[in-house]
Amino acid sequence: MEATDIWGEIERSESYLVCSMYEEAESLSSSILKRIFGNIDVLSDEASQGDHQFHDMLESAGMVLVQSLHGIGRTVEIVNELRDVFGEVAAIPVQVLLTGVCLQISNGSYLGVRDILEEFFRIWVYKDNHYILNDAGVSTKGFHAKNCLDIDEYMEVVELYTFGVLAKFSNDMGLAISWVEKAALPEERRQGILRRLHSLLSLKTASSFEENSKDSSYAVVNNKKSLGNEKNDEIDSFLKLSKQHEPWSLWSSHPLSLKVGNTQFSMSRGKVAVSLVGLIICYALKRKRAALIRIIRRQMESTRKAIVDFWKLAFSYQVNPLAAIQSIPSTTT
């Protein structure tokens, strides 16, 4: 029971993968695939469901292979490993191809990706609303794989190629649009992809225009800054020259020197100015002092005189001490 044994091995490789035993899973899945391709005729005769079960074996073992390669850090080798193990691109199940390519692209590696996808498109032909293998380009090994694809499976590969490789990696939206327009695709699906590509192109164009506008704005600002700096330099130079030709000022920071005999005194002009102002104020106050004293004396004298007059007036008023007990004389009628 060759098929039963292979399924048991596939389940064991899946267990390794679940347990994160990636090296064991990779080794066993690769061995299973080689064993399958070494016994194609026997498996085709023993499989109760024919090629359908054969395809399921390839798909299950292939999924373990690509995920285990990713787990052990060999993601960049996935496409090349698929070619080596399966031999023919036609023999690689679509889901295995998609998963492997996506894992490799997500790791930032496009090594062999474009070549394997373009070879995939060459061997599948659109006919009667589905895709079939082009027998002229497929060997006996590939012919035993699934030889018919529905539209949804094929379109998944188309979208990965147009958006993930041409539009993103090659950064050529025009090439992606041109390829879709010429590819053998159902018209409704073609128009859907073209609309998405044109939308992306519009967004990219708008983004580029915005970046160019920002660059232009930055250039204008930088030019203005440079002009401003030049003007500031000119102003600084002018100020320096004006300081050099500045007339003598009492408030200047340069010190004044005075030599008396063998002794030399040095004092800043600011201190000299403050001292002169102080002397002027003292002189003015001294001259005003006598006048101020006279004014104050006159005011004090007038105040004292007013107080004395008030008291004299108060005590000069005669009061009769018997007025309180004398009766008021009555009038006669």
Curated annotation (Swiss-Prot):
Report keywords, A-Z.
Membrane, Peroxisome, Transmembrane, Transmembrane helix
Q: What happens when the gene is disrupted?
A: Embryo lethality, when homozygous.
Per its UniProt entry, which superkingdom is the organism in? Eukaryota
Q: Which residues lie on this side of the membrane: Peroxisomal?
A: 103-268
Its main subcellular localisation, reduced to a broad class, is: membrane
Q: How does it sit in the membrane?
A: Multi-pass membrane protein
The GO biological-process annotations, alphabetized, read as: peroxisomal membrane transport; peroxisomal transport
What does the entry state regarding organ or tissue expression? Expressed in roots, leaves, stems, flowers, buds and fruits.
Q: Where in the cell is it found?
A: Peroxisome membrane
The transmembrane segments are 91-102, 269-285
Annotated disulfide bonds? none
Q: Which residues lie on this side of the membrane: Cytoplasmic?
A: 1-90, 286-333
- Tell me what happens on changing residue 278 to E: In apem9-1; loss of peroxisomal localization, but no effect on the interaction with PEX6
**One annotated Gene Ontology cellular component of this protein:** nucleolus
The record ties this protein, via PANTHER family, to: PROTEIN APEM9
Q: How does it assemble?
A: Interacts with PEX6 and PEX19-1, but not with PEX1. Interacts (via N-terminus) with PEX13, and (via N-terminus and C-terminus) with PEX16.
Described by its record, this protein's role is as follows:
Involved in peroxisome biogenesis and matrix protein import. Required for pollen maturation and in vivo germination via its role in peroxisomal function, which partially involves jasmonic acid biosynthesis. Transported to peroxisomes via the interaction with PEX19-1. Required for peroxisomal protein import by acting as an anchoring protein for the AAA ATPase complex, which consists of PEX1 and PEX6.
Report the protein name in the record.
Answer: Protein APEM9
Species this chain originates from: Arabidopsis thaliana
Q: Which gene encodes it?
A: APEM9
